[in-house]
């Protein structure tokens, strides 16, 4: 038998577009804002869950204003995230949104219940256990989430690609050993 290919888009809950991302698989609303043929997953840092539990505020940022967050995890991420929260409060970050972390978590769970997407994957545990840490932070996994996948973005300078990135794939296959025995 053949199984069709599948892809998955991951986004972290600090991203300014995260709430729109949550709704990509919904069956209601503006169809131009929906994406029914791709899987979605949240790449959740531990600090988000701590803020949910403590009923604290959560900030969503434009990644252009805080580009380091994407490649950080654990304490380094927490420190830089809190740094940008303070900058936002001082008016030094232009594009951000603040809301109760618990409210955002409720939205995540509501949409997950309605659509089975995005599934929740936890960034810090995945990176702590990542066997190729010398390659940098891992940003995604295979569809079953038991294998973390390393990716690197292409690099551009003045609109020209100067370095090609790396795309991760997970090829699944099966072999019926009996067919190969004599």
Q: Which residue stretches match the model-derived regions?
A:
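Active-site cavity-forming subdomains of large catalytic enzyme subunits
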Residues: 1-174, 181
